[in-house]
Structures are given as C-alpha cells and as structure tokens.
Amino acid sequence: MRSVLVPPAEHHKVLFEPIDIGPKTLRNRLYNVPHGTAYGTLRPATWASYRAARAEGGWAVVSTEFSSVDPSSDEWPLHSSDIWDEEDACRHKLMVDSVHDHGALASIELHHGGVHALRRLSREPALSASGMSSDLPPPACPPGTPKIMSRNDIERVQQSFVNAAVRARDVGYDIVDVLAGYGYLCAQFLSPFHNHRTDGYGGSLGNRARFWLETLSQVRDAVGGDCAIATRLAVETQGPWGQSIDDTVALVRMADPLVDLWDLNVGSLDWGSDISPSRVIPEGRNLELFGRVRRAAQKPVVGVSRLTSPDLMAQAVRSGLIDIVGSARQSIADPFFPQKVLEGRTEDIRECMGINHCISSLDRGNLTCAQNATSGEEFRRGWHPERFDVLARPEVSVLVVGAGPAGMEAAIGLAKRGADMVHLVDAAEHLGGHLRPVGRLSGLQEWTRFIDHRMIQIGKLPNLQFIPSTRLDADDIRDYGASHVVVATGAQWSGTGLTPGTHAPLEGVVEGADWVFTPEQLLIEGRRPVEGSQVTVYDAEGYYMGAGVAQLLADEGYKVDLVTPHAQVAAEADMTLEGSAIRDSLHGSGVAMHREVLLSAAQFGRIYGVGQFEEPFTLETDALVLVTVRVPVDGLYQELVRDHEALEEAGIEAVHCIGDALSPRPLADVTFEGHRLAREFESPNPAIALPYKREPLRLVRRGAFSDPLD
C-alpha cells in the first residue's frame, strides 16, 4: 500500500532547486554521475533501459560510463562504451533519447586510458605522457612499455576528443564531460608520477596541465555553444607522488573559464579511494575536500561521497560544500530515490548498503545490485524497479517458509502482485535470516539496511503477514491451508570442513566437537573457545565471513591464525575494493595469515595440510573455526516434494525452493531469485527462469549479422 504523498521535508527542498550549468538547466540537484555498467555500446538496449530508469526516477542528469574516444583507448573486455564513429553514435542516441523521454539531461564522459588502456581489440601501442609503464599489475593491464606521445600524437588524440564531442552533441547529449580523473590520460599528464616530460607538457603544474587545458578548450570551441562542458577531476589522488588538494585548487583556477561544471572525485587508478565500501569509509568522507574546491571555483561543483541520506545531501548543498549531489551507487540501489524524496516517501528508499557487489559484478561483465534485483534487468526481463504486473489469478494463498533475503524478496513481490494472502513464516524472532548476524561483524552494520527496507515494506502490505518464532514441519505445511508453498530455509556452514579444494570433509573433524566452531555458532549461538586460547580460522570462502570472524575473535582477545587456500586473504574482497583494508586491519590486530594452504586433516591441538609447493603444513591450535562452504538446508523441501499425493490432498498446487536452500550464493543472486519467482509466478514452470532478451547481434536468414535495434 502506497503511503499518502506529502511535499518534501523543508530541509530537503534545497535538493529540488533548479540550477544552470552553461546553456543547460538541471531540474534538481541530484546528478547520476558517470559509472560503469558493463553494458555500454555493445548492449545498447540494456544500457539505454538501465539509464532510462534513473531518468524516470527523477535524477536531473543521467550519465554514461567513460566513453572511449578512439581505438588507441580500446578498453575491451571492460564492455565500456565507445564513440569512435557514426555506428557508435547511433547506439548512443538510443540512450540519449531514452533519458530525454523522462525529462532528464544526458551526459557523456569522454575518455582516453593512456597507459592503462587495454587495447586488446585494436592492438595499438599504449600512449603515455613520458613512457612510464602502467602501475597496474598483470593481468589487469598488459605488460609493456608505452609509446611516449609526440606532438602529432597529442594533436591526434585531442582531435579524437573533439570528434567524439561533436558526435555526442549531434545525437543530443546535453553535457560533455572530459575525464581527467582515475589516473587516465589527462590525469597522467597532470601527475608528476607519470609525467616526466621536459617540453611544454611537463615540469611545472601549469605545463603538466597543458594537455588537459588544450583539450578542454578545443572541446569547448567545438560544442560549448550547444552543450555544457564538464570535467571530472580528482581533488586528491591520495598517493605519495600524486596530486594534492593545493594542486587541484590551482588547476581549478586555471580551467574555470573553460568549464561549466566541476565533477569531483577522490583517488587515482586505485579507485577504491573513491568508491570504497561502507566497511572502509563513512558516508560523506570527502565533502570537506570538495568544499575547498567549491570555494575556489566560479562554476558549480558536483561531488560524490557515498551519499545515501537525503538529510546529509541537503546539508552538504546548504552548507556550500557542493552545489549538486553526485550519486552512482545510490542510483543503482534505488533509481527512484529523487522521486521518493520529492514525494516525502523517504521511508521507501532502498538505501545503498555499500557492499560493492555492483563493482564486483561490473568487473565480471554485468552490473547487478544486492539491494535492487531489477538493476540491469529493465530491458532483459522487462522489470520496472517500482511496478509489478498484477497476477492473472490473484486468489492464491502463499506460504513462504524462511524470512531470509530470498524469502523476504519473494513474499514482498507476490504481495505487490496482489496475491490474496502471503504468510512469511520464520523460526527466528526477527526478519533477515543469515544476514542479520552478519551485521554484527566489524564494519558490516550497513548490510542490515537490506532487512530494514524490507521490514518497512512488509509493514505496508495488508496482504502480507510476517509470523515469527514459528517452526513448521512438513505436516504443519500440509495442514496450513496454503495453495502455494515457497521454501526459503537458507543454508548453514559445513561443520565438517567440506571444502572446494578437496571436495571432502577434513579428516578427524567431528561435527559438534567442542573445539570445532562454525560462524553460526559464534554469531547466533554465542559459543566461544576457551578464553585466551589459540584459534585458527580456516577460510576457504575468501570473502567477508572468514576475515570477519577472525577480526571478531582478535578484537575479543584471542590469538588468531587465519589459514586460506587462496593466493590472498579475503581474495574475493579485492573485487569489492576492500581486500587491502581487511588485510591491513587483520595485520594490525595481530592475526597471523597463512596463504595458499590447503588443509586436509585436524585434531584437537593441531591442523595439517599442504602449502603452495606441496610442502607439509602443520599448526598448533586450541580451536578451529570452519568457514569453508555453505550447505543447503533443504530437508523440509525434499520431504514435501517426495509425497505428491499428500500435497494434492492438502490442496497445495506447487512447492518451490529458492535462495540458499536451493543453492547457497552471494546476496545479490539469492535476492534476484526470490524476485524472479515473484515476477514469474504464473509462468509454466517458475522453477526455471524465462528466457531473457539478448543483444546486440543476431543471426539472420542469409547468415549475416544484424542489430536488433535496426
């Protein structure tokens, strides 16, 4: 049930004041800044539909990710966007028109990677200010020494920026943003770390800025009468040889006449400085730095700082730290954030948890979100972030057993589709399943925003009832009176040390032994090893749990060893840009870390395994915490589906198993599955996902290829 609309709170009204940037006017102060999706111009319909949802949700500006200006900055396989030629421009036009259809301005970020460009399709040599190789280690960037850009190279690349800007203007972009941050080509010229030139493009700050200033000037001359000109600039690169805030203030004064908008961030190629997860940086950390630039600039400033609270956003604008609020992750989690604030429905906001699943999924080729299952599915599956189709047969009663992430998502979706009755039943007292105790780990408190949002939505839906502290067996379910049953009973960590590396339990480990622990026993049951004892955490998962419980135990005074078969502790956390921070924290807490060790056996007092080169490994320990694999808790489902006659007699038409009970996976995946079940509840077989739309190329009858957008 939708709440009664009220005007935005008085302290939020500043967010909805229009502001001029050059020849364009923003309808409010909420700016969807450049951010990657991995869709780009290779999946233009997916890309356009994703951006259009943000425009429909009320953002004043919707931006592309970085768009490569010519083949010397080919970024394959990053699946970013290109604007090299008219074919690319046609694909951009689809996105621009989709954004304009909802009243937002469209912005493009023009990019050249310089020494960091991947060039795997173009196979051109990397270009650089002065022949300094990429500081990205293989395989992130190909090895090799880049070409020092000649004057001809400089002019050619600058012309590529101009040509790209003209193409952007011609397809309707309102804002052209020249990327001078994140350690790419313009930033490489600005940086004394990369720029060792002795000509007019190196040496002093003014000389190092010359390439960037000339590029801005040429772009402005070409399209500045039609488009607003912006540039994305790091206020600090946060490295020992980088760009300081004082440098940035000087750069802003140099370039202020050439731009209409300053698009600010923090950090360089280590973009974790700018978009670290909530475990690492607090909301609004960079605002004071932006304020220093704002005081030096004559043009408006947009800044990003992991802002999710409309209160803090409004305060930042009112206090003059920024003029416009930049957001990427919050727009992924809730495309309709602006509309909800405008309508006074802040309680309905899906607040970004800052877990950076979006970053890890982007790097794997498809941006998705743990908080918002519809992100990236707007075209592929036709899902709208706020609207559901009504069930063709709403006279159904659905029993959802298990109120973890998948169960909550399925129950809410079915209730929003108009099911007569949805009961969400859990043996625990509170919503959340395994996610609730995760919030007790250091730095992961904001993960429980997932639960908070769904708790509010459940309270608003009159046809959805949460029934806590109720454990149901198969007989209870058959007697319940529901026409449909969804089993979402989750998973539990293996108590025997079953691992991916051996596909077997640890020899000598007996589940339930008083010296063996699982994360559930530590976080839910409150069990602990003997005070002051030596504890080993065996982490075969490699994400948040192993490092999290190691940190917890170290903070409680235990002597902790963390053993992992992976090449790095918390290796998966590198994908979410928090691995280094996790390892630094563990090291600072005295946790001894042992990498590339595969355990095979354990007994009270000692564990056994092999190292990277098959050398024997042994370690004395008083207690062993097993963070290896999660095992589905699917016994209830299996018992139900074994007896089809009993289900038929009970009037149960279908039983579905979802989430970790089906297959233990990351939060985003089980959330997606619960959401998909609700969306496809009346499909011929809801257990199997309906086909999604694929693009951009399809075979045609004559054997050639065609674009589905033609």
Locations of regions flagged by a protein language model:
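Flavin-dependent oxidoreductase catalytic cores
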Residues: 1-401, 405, 409-416, 422, ...
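Beta1-alpha1 glycine-rich phosphate/pyrophosphate-binding loop at the start
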Residues: 262, 393-465, 537-577, 581, ...
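Internal hydrophobic alpha-helix adjacent to the cofactor/substrate pocket in enzyme cavities
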Residues: 334, 339-340, 410-412, 549, ...
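Glycine-rich dinucleotide-binding loop and its adjacent helix/turn
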Residues: 379-391, 457-460, 466, 494-556, ...
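A Rossmann-like FAD-binding core segment of flavoenzymes
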Residues: 448-494, 511-514, 518-527, 531-533, ...
